[in-house]
Regions:
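Acidic, metal-coordinating catalytic segment for phosphate/diphosphate chemistry
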Residues: 11-45, 51
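Nudix hydrolase/Nudix homology domain
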Residues: 10, 32, 69, 110-112, ...
Length: 184
């Protein structure tokens, strides 16, 4: 429920797509309920690289319900029912970062991470990559700040300052780094 100018508006809760270990859809559930019950659901993570082989990082907004203020990959979220992974990636890149670039899927993986607020991420994550030299036009409801960082410097900083980054980013990065370095 949201109070807009004294009028209460009931907003439909965002739903996530529940999946099995093979990414077959099992149904949908409210996002908060899925995170409270640690139910496996579909998600995605986008990585945008520039021509200098730097990764576009976002600092999550301080108002986020988990991992506020932490640095992470360019964009991450959940697919909607009936939406392809690439459609979801494009939608959220525009909503969060104001960028539209071609994306391609690199790999998927499953992870589970609990947070100190009682919520748990249990996601089958589709990792995508795109390329752009454009600075984002961030949505400050979602993103506090952004920066470009070389992959090698980032790899060292994740070891030196792990608490500055989201749990899932630390899990994904090594695999992303290996995949990208084999292709660059």
């Amino acid at each position: 429920m949201c109070n807009i100018l004294g009028i209460f508006v009931f907003m439909e809760e965002e739903k996530v797509v529940l999946v099995d270990l093979k990414d077959q859809q099992l149904g949908t559930m409210g996002k908060m309920e899925a995170h409270e019950k640690a139910i496996l659901h579909r998600a995605f993570s986008v990585f945008i690289l520039n021509s200098k082989k730097e990764l576009l990082l976002q600092q999550r907004a301080f108002g986020k319900y988990h991992s506020p203020g932490l640095w992470t990959n360019t964009c991450c979220s959940h697919q909607r029912e009936g939406e392809t992974n690439l459609e979801a990636g494009h939608r959220r890149m525009m909503e969060e970062m104001g960028i539209s670039v071609p994306l391609r899927e690199l790999f998927t993986f499953i992870y589970e991470a609990s947070f100190d607020n009682g919520l748990t991420e249990h996601e089958l994550d589709h990792v995508m990559v795109g390329y752009s030299d454009e600075d984002p036009k961030i949505n400050t409801d979602e993103v506090e700040s952004f920066k470009w960082m070389s992959l090698d410097v980032l790899k060292k900083d994740l070891v030196k300052n792990p608490n500055d980054y989201t749990v899932w980013f630390a899990i994904i990065f090594d695999r992303f780094y290996q995949h990208v370095n084999n292709k660059l």
